[in-house]
Swiss-Prot record:
There is a cross-link at K376 (Glycyl lysine isopeptide (Lys-Gly) (interchain with G-Cter in SUMO2)). It comes from Homo sapiens (Human). PROSITE patterns: SAP (PS50800), ZF_RING_1 (PS00518), ZF_RING_2 (PS50089), ZF_UBZ4 (PS51908). The modification N-acetylmethionine is found at M1. Zn(2+) binds at C204, C207, H219, C223. It catalyses: S-ubiquitinyl-[E2 ubiquitin-conjugating enzyme]-L-cysteine + [acceptor protein]-L-lysine = [E2 ubiquitin-conjugating enzyme]-L-cysteine + N(6)-ubiquitinyl-[acceptor protein]-L-lysine. Belongs to the RAD18 family. The keyword Ubl conjugation applies. Changing S442A: Does not interact with SLF1 and is defective in restoring cell survival after DNA damage. This is E3 ubiquitin-protein ligase RAD18. The keyword DNA-binding applies. Residues 152-197, 400-423, 456-495 are annotated as: Disordered.
Length: 495
């Protein structure tokens, strides 16, 4: 099959491009190789191309009509046309190169010449015909009219009396020579060559078709040879049957390798490679079954091996282009050169990756900053809540401690109340100051300060507690009296 580059035609043969396009497959865009026609839509494709396509989709690639492989039929005339076009291509190109190029100026001048001269010729013929008719009418006029005309001419041209009678005789002779004979005018004109002759047709004794008598011998020869060709074609078709389709999902590895061995194919590779190899063999084998002279199975196996080798070479070349290969014998300088070449070759790709990484880092940094601020706010709120809870606990413990200490010292209740109130005020001030500074100090520092203040207060009142040793009965009485005094005070405070 010729490539697309060979299908270019020179400007002189631009008309051949349409024929060239019509003789190409619509799938591979090469010349038809074992052309097959789809009877439902009359579209033509290469046998191998359409079989591969139908294994993917059971429809026509052009009009999407449902088609199966048994529906395909041979179209031998297209194969013959492709052969004849390839044979005539060189002759046509040579003829186009040898023939001189016609300039547009020369062609236009010829057209003008035709336009100018054709009306002149027609006018001359019309003038000659009118003159002949005039002369013919003058000859057949009566004698009286001729005499009258002669008299008028004599009267008009009186100065020309000196003209000799010999001139008159010459004029009459010339008129007689120009005028046609009436017998010749009455003769029927011969039929022109442009009129078609009646063609006699004869029935062919072999096929019974009406054939012109002049071509009957040629038709008989072709008709008899056609019968021989039909018999040979029928015999060749029955010799080779196409391979049936196989369901690879139901086949085990062992059965698949057995099928490959039957046709002489290689069994190396994984299951997917083996399936692909067998599919390719089946497509090529069935496509060759449609040919007049099909290839043998061994030839198809060799073609498949060559295709696989070229495919592996291409894959290896692609890998070598993108991968650095080192050997044991290479020196450090050679390795550095390979590295530098690789960097230069893929500099743009590296830069693209760097830019992408930077963009991604910026996005991640922005997201992380947002999350950090949110976490900080959450932590500050948690700390504030914990500090407030700790302060409330400390307040309750301090008040309980104050009440117990006052109950233990009833003699000095009255004078110590003022001190207790002042100390409570101090503690409240400390707590309020600690609340204001809670955002800056941690909860542990605040608790430590409160404990230190409590220890200092206990140390200051330790001596008073040691001096007042009261019996349990007195303690009970003092507690009852204190509770009685404290209740109205609390009520007053509430009111």
């Amino acid at each position: 099959m010729d490539s697309l580059a060979e299908s270019r035609w020179p400007p002189g043969l631009a008309v051949m491009k349409t024929i060239d396009d019509l003789l190409r497959c619509g799938i591979c865009f090469e010349y038809f190789n074992i052309a097959m026609i789809i009877p439902q839509c009359s579209h033509n494709y290469c046998s191998l191309c359409i079989r591969k396509f139908l294994s993917y989709k059971t429809q026509c690639p052009t009009c999407c009509v449902t088609v199966t492989e048994p529906d395909l039929k041979n179209n031998r005339i297209l194969d013959e046309l492709v052969k004849s076009l390839n044979f005539a291509r060189n002759h046509l190109l040579q003829f186009a190169l040898e023939s001189p190029a016609k300039s547009p100026a020369s062609s236009s001048s010829k057209n003008l010449a035709v336009k100018v001269y054709t009306p002149v010729a027609s006018r001359q013929s019309l003038k000659q015909g009118s003159r002949l008719m005039d002369n013919f009418l003058i000859r057949e006029m009566s004698g009286s009219t001729s005499e009258l005309l002669i008299k008028e001419n004599k009267s008009k041209f009186s100065p020309q009396k000196e003209a000799s009678p010999a001139a008159k005789t010459k004029e009459t002779r010339s008129v007689e020579e120009i005028a046609p004979d009436p017998s010749e005018a009455k003769r029927p004109e011969p039929p022109s060559t442009s009129t078609l002759k009646q063609v006699t047709k004869v029935d062919c004794p072999v096929c019974g078709v009406n054939i012109p008598e002049s071509h009957i011998n040629k038709h008989l020869d072709s008709c008899l040879s056609r019968e021989e060709k039909k018999e040979s074609l029928r015999s060749s078709v029955h010799k080779r049957k196409p391979l049936p389709k196989t369901v690879y999902n139901l086949l085990s590895d062992r059965d698949l390798k057995k099928k490959l061995k039957e046709h002489g194919l290689s069994i190396q590779g994984n299951k997917q490679q083996l399936i692909k190899r067998h599919q390719e063999f089946v497509h090529m084998y069935n496509a060759q079954c449609d040919a007049l002279h099909p290839k043998s199975a061994a030839e198809i196996v060799r073609e498949i091996e060559n295709i696989e080798k070229t495919r592996m070479r291409l894959e290896a070349s692609k890998l070598n282009e993108s991968v650095m290969v080192f050997t044991k014998d290479q020196t450090e300088k050679e390795i550095d050169e390979i590295h530098s070449k690789y960097r230069k070759k893929h500099k743009s790709e590296f830069q693209l990756l760097v830019d992408q990484a930077r963009k991604g880092y910026k996005k991640i940094a922005g997201m992380s900053q947002k999350t950090v601020t949110i976490t900080k706010e959450d932590e500050s709120t948690e700390k504030l809540s914990s500090v407030c809870m700790g302060q409330e606990d400390n307040m309750t413990s301090v008040t309980n401690h104050f009440s117990q200490s006052k109950l233990d010292s009833p003699e000095e209740l009255e004078p110590d109340r003022e001190e207790d109130s002042s100390s409570c005020i101090d503690i409240q001030e400390v707590l309020s100051s600690s609340e204001s500074d809670s955002c800056n100090s941690s909860s542990s520092d605040i608790i430590r300060d409160l404990l230190e203040e409590e220890e200092a207060w206990e140390a200051s009142h330790k001596n008073d507690l040691q001096d007042t040793e009261i019996s349990p009965r007195q303690n009970r009485r003092t507690r009852a009296a204190e509770s009685a005094e404290i209740e109205p005070r609390n009520k007053r405070n509430r009111n």
